[in-house]
Amino acid sequence: MVEQKDYVSYSVLINGIEVNAVYSRDSIDGIFRPLLRRLTRMQREKNRRVLVLFAAPPGAGKSTLLSFLERLAEEDEHSGEVQVIGMDGFHRRQAYLVSRTVIRDGEEIPMTRIKGAPETFDLEKLTERLQMVAAGERCGWPVYDRRLHDPVDNVITVDGDIVLLEGNYLLLDEPGWRDLRGFADYTVLIRADEDMLRRRLTDRKAGAWRPVRKRKSSWISAT
């Protein structure tokens, strides 16, 4: 993390790809620090684990942002300890996707062609594990291995007091998915320009990533 007068540059490996992000001082001091301190107060008042859901489309920079928040909390004496986890570990296994089909626009196609869509996640398993996290249990958490193209279970041990969970569909208003917010103490929805998202996803597939500059306008809704 390199600090300048008006911004902070931050580099981190996300799924094996080096990401270079730039966050303005206005965003850090006006949004990020106040959010972390609010969550800290909430955790202390409730005297239990606090679970926060961060939802955003692919390419919005949510993994990088939460990594930055985790780092920021470590350096802020007024913030509690933060632990970041993601929902990618709940992808269905490749063998499952290969053996099943789905109807799209009247055509039956293999589920592998829509990998990453809501129905290609194990929602039941995610719900069960989220229930454990929300209850304050110390539990294992899976991650997605992009080399294996499969999830690996219990790579992370969830034991933090303030847990930030990021994912594409955590606030999706569809059966089953909409129940997830009931486990959360706080939710954040991040929106971003569609053209920017397309550029980033193209770069991601090429093994590159454009520097990210988060602005206040990216934060649309928090409850």
What do the predicted segments below correspond to?
Residues 33-45:
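Pre-Walker A adenine-sensing motif
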Residues 148-204:
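ATP-dependent NMP and nucleoside kinases share a basic, alpha-helical "lid"
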Residues 83-86, 90-146:
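Conserved nucleotide-sensing/catalytic segment adjacent to the nucleotide-binding pocket
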Residues 71-83:
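Post-Walker A helix-loop "phosphate-sensing" segment adjacent to the P-loop in P-loop NTPases
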Residues 1-31:
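Charged, amphipathic alpha-helical linker segments immediately N-terminal to NTP-binding catalytic cores
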Residues 62:
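Conserved lysine of the Walker
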